């Protein structure tokens, strides 16, 4: 994978989730030459750490796969928080948990509230979600889900008896099962969609970029670290190309348009290095400002999560699969048949609920696992166990990203300000109490051998918050650090109608940094949707027709509307 020329119509910086979509879609126009520059390595088909779903814990913290970011000391947690980001073609879609969640329709209604953002409401986003999906778990008559897109989605199957008991425990706690968390009703408990197809990870690179590589007008260059943007000598706001380093050598490539798709960390960093950001801050780092956009690196959002772990009384969990002696058999089963414990991401089910009556739609997300193990591979000291991941979904805490110097290889200063507001603290206490209430229901009695973490000694609000401060981890959903918004918004960076950086020429942003607000759930699906929609904008194509559909609204619809029991197709 190498570039064949020195000038392109489009140069895409970043071959991650958004960059893979753009590379595939923009190269559909045969008269346009497209180059994707990826700083990481290729996602080789033989690389088990990428391709094997259950190996998802191994790339994180490994310098060959992960940029290994860290926040500064978080002021309200008293420690730094590790952030894994994909250093490989496919970006974080090549190392993430493979969970596919659109978010709640009301997330996008919130996106559309500001002036000029009306084309980002749910009706305008839904056709692009459908365009990217092939949803094998959806009913063939389901008009809300996609059935022939490049991202192949497996439903559940959540057949381990612990899943059924967890879903039933949710019902006993006063909630409902839902037919599809990505369909009419997000609120409730049920199987999740995962980006696993025929036992292999379905990354954005696998789905979009690799099938397009046969095109002569698409080039992909890996291990190409972009160090700066090139500007017109006579127009300081017109981008004409990029400079990148590969194998110690500097290269320059020219472009009619440059599209930043480096993600929520890399995109604002490169903008600031290029003189686009808060003018006074840039001057303090010895950088001449080109465009005063104080929102670059601000409005930073993320989801924080914790694991509540339990000992399992019956030998039905997947804990034995963590035994080193069993791993060769599990690995061989996957290599030769793409089956067995290694063929699943094991995030096969969970749920979304409202923690209080003041919120209009779910503010808590649960991932259930029939195993007790941390994301870094540290397992609980029990023969059998299970856990639930939980955290608030739309915290009002906001952080920032700022470069430390003019050196593009120096990692930026990152602070998310987790737990910085009273509302954030309140929702965290509610999250733990709601999760514990579900896990203590009768449906879990046959398996409940007692809480391992945080443990029965953690009970008061302050004890809960202390535990979250000590044990909380990022859910790896950074976003909104170069947000879309109208020019009238002083903190907006990207024009929502063109995806161009305000005040700049030939420069666009298409990735998670452009999200105006984070969504309720894992953010990979919204990033794919955003990139699909942006591709039509960039190509000057007529956008897909908006699709106005009903979706579940608490307090307006019958509380059982869209629940599993309403549709015989969905029974579990």
UniProtKB/Swiss-Prot annotation:
Involved in the biosynthesis of the osmoprotectant glycine betaine. Catalyzes the oxidation of choline to betaine aldehyde and betaine aldehyde to glycine betaine at the same rate. Keywords: FAD, Flavoprotein, NAD, Oxidoreductase. The active site is at 477 (proton acceptor). It comes from the Bacteria. It catalyses: choline + A = betaine aldehyde + AH2; betaine aldehyde + NAD(+) + H2O = glycine betaine + NADH + 2 H(+). GO terms for molecular function: betaine-aldehyde dehydrogenase (NAD+) activity; choline dehydrogenase activity; flavin adenine dinucleotide binding. Pfam families: GMC_oxred_C, GMC_oxred_N. FAD binds at residues 9-38. Belongs to the GMC oxidoreductase family. Its cofactor is FAD. This is Oxygen-dependent choline dehydrogenase. InterPro entries: BetA, FAD/NAD-bd_sf, GMC_OxRdtase, GMC_OxRdtase_N, GMC_OxRtase_C. GO terms for biological process: glycine betaine biosynthetic process from choline. The keyword RNA-binding does not apply. Gene3D superfamilies: FAD/NAD(P)-binding domain (3.50.50.60), Glucose Oxidase, domain 3 (3.30.560.10). Its EC number is 1.1.99.1, 1.2.1.8.
